[in-house]
Amino acid sequence: MKYVGIDLGTTNSAICSFDGEKIHLYKSPEQHDVTPSAIFIDRRGNKYVGSRAYNSAAKNPDNAAVLFKRLMGTSTPVKLPAVNLTMTPEECSAEVLRTLFGYLPEEIRGDGDTGTVITVPAAFNQMQKDSTMSAADAAGLGRVALMQEPVAAVMSVMRQRKNDGVFVVYD
């Protein structure tokens, strides 16, 4: 079984996989370790996610959705007035998740035996967690589990260090 880990961040997001031995971080098409959690829709209706969306948002903020993770678990819509479009925070997050999943090699994406873990802030309430699960479902990720960010950090440190000890993780 293969595992995929996703940091669905407020500002930036990232994706990696674990094959049982090694963790692989997948870069964006621009060769960045992280992808901006941004969506941009141009006047023709073309949708962009990531760096191009983030860079375009600076010039045309009314065509862009950024910082939508802060709205997860609420009924507050994400408005893109320049293109007369309203999206839910879940729809925005699903776009980012689909984009990240597209960075994976086909043998991982097409594997029906891939489990996905998405990290969420420790302060996320149940509505925000449910909203994140809805976004993952809308993105077609299949089997998904959520893990609080500090827990994921401790697990990463424990995997890298084989000796006993006390580890403190600050988030």
Describe the function of each predicted region.
Residues M1-P36, I41-Y170:
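N-terminal phosphate-binding loop and flanking beta/alpha elements of the actin-like ATPase fold
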